[in-house]
Amino acid sequence: VWLLPEMADSLGGRMEVLELWPLAQCEIAARPRSIVDELFAGDFADRYPFDRDDFIERLTAGGYPEALERRSGRRRQAWFDSYLATILQRDVRDLAQIEGLTELPRLLQLLAARSGGLLNMAELSRSTGLAQTTLRRYMGLLEVLFLIRQVPAWSSNLGKRLQKSPKLFLSDYGLMAH
């Protein structure tokens, strides 16, 4: 529907847009509460008997159902390779007139390394060699493709909140580890 804007326009009031995020660990494990909820409830240790290797495996597997279906790390890597190639080549070409298709994979790698940190456009511009206006356009496109998310700064003071830098996250921890 999004690729045919005239169709989306004609469905006004008859469609709903849902953002589907990768699965959370509680969804993957079919648990009613999240790990954070159980940690605060004080019953974390008894319910999650996994060790460091299990934890790393869970993180690198991510939350995309298709990636989770692949049991071996090699097959998951192949899925992530294919997923990123499809999005960064075909979908980008369909959505925008971008001349720097070759720059997007490297930009995504740099953003993955900075995931969870404050977004510093000047430093990112120096690291990539891209102008800040180009970076903003590319990052907007990566957000539309649900690969990254910018989380606004938080402060109880509205003025400070508007001045602070947002944090940047990749949409999936398996994608970030890839």
Per-segment meaning from a language model:
Residues 1-7, 142:
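Sensor-1/coupling segment of RecA-like P-loop NTPase cores
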Residues 5-113, 117:
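Interdomain motor-coupling "hinge/lid" segment immediately C-terminal to the ATP-binding subdomain
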